[in-house]
UniProtKB/Swiss-Prot annotation:
Stated name of the protein: Imidazole glycerol phosphate synthase subunit HisH
Annotated compartments: Cytoplasm
Gene Ontology CC annotations of this record: cytoplasm
Protein task: IGPS catalyzes the conversion of PRFAR and glutamine to IGP, AICAR and glutamate. The HisH subunit catalyzes the hydrolysis of glutamine to glutamate and ammonia as part of the synthesis of IGP and AICAR. The resulting ammonia molecule is channeled to the active site of HisF.
Pfam families for the chain: GATase
Catalytic activity line of the entry: 5-[(5-phospho-1-deoxy-D-ribulos-1-ylimino)methylamino]-1-(5-phospho-beta-D-ribosyl)imidazole-4-carboxamide + L-glutamine = D-erythro-1-(imidazol-4-yl)glycerol 3-phosphate + 5-amino-1-(5-phospho-beta-D-ribosyl)imidazole-4-carboxamide + L-glutamate + H(+); L-glutamine + H2O = L-glutamate + NH4(+)
Alphabetical UniProt keywords: Amino-acid biosynthesis, Cytoplasm, Glutamine amidotransferase, Histidine biosynthesis, Hydrolase, Lyase
Gene3D superfamilies xref list: 3.40.50.880
Lineage top rank: taxon: Bacteria
KW Cell inner membrane (keyword) present: no
Source organism of this protein record: Oleidesulfovibrio alaskensis (strain ATCC BAA-1058 / DSM 17464 / G20) (Desulfovibrio alaskensis)
GO biological process, one term: L-histidine biosynthetic process
Positions of the catalytic residues: 79 (nucleophile), 187, 189
Amino acid sequence: MLAILKYKAGNQTSVRRALNHIGIPNVITADPAEIAASEGIIFPGVGAAGQAMDELTAAGLDAVLKEQVEAGKPLLGICVGCQIMLDYSQENDTRTLGIIPGECHLFNPALEDETGAPIRVPHMGWNRVIPRKPCALFKGISDDAEFYFVHSYFPNPQPDYVIATTTYGKEFCSVHGGPGLWAVQFHPEKSGRPGLKLLSNFHAYCKEAANAQ
């Protein structure tokens, strides 16, 4: 069973729909006991970093997430969830969770795309995600696969935590973390077959980790 974190800045329904489509048991919950009993946590997010942190803190879920990570529970952050797993976001000048060392920065609209035209901010659309190190999330996914992005800010973790990169005006980190602790800037639940495969890979990792305990 995967726990989808329930708070007011998350897009839980679309994540649940994707998991249901591929037969992965899941629950949308803010209950610390249910979260602790799950095999892994999905931490979605939409909107602004400041709002998301306010909602997490008000519900006491910031502490719950940190406790579960310290206990070794697998975690997958998505979009704003990915961003606020870092220490700080330029958006709303926000101190974030500090689960992974790094910051989140605004795209510079003066950057140019491959045609020489200024990039549009927010970045919206399909882009390749290039793994820079082996990662269980990408097992069985083609290097040519594209994922769906909607964001104005991008993660900038410490180099050791960069797992995959994407180019949009510049090369930026689109997946960061480490074994069992992952954050993806794109929306796997909206990314068709590659996104569903990534979610399936996360679930498989969670089950294996739970069985090993």
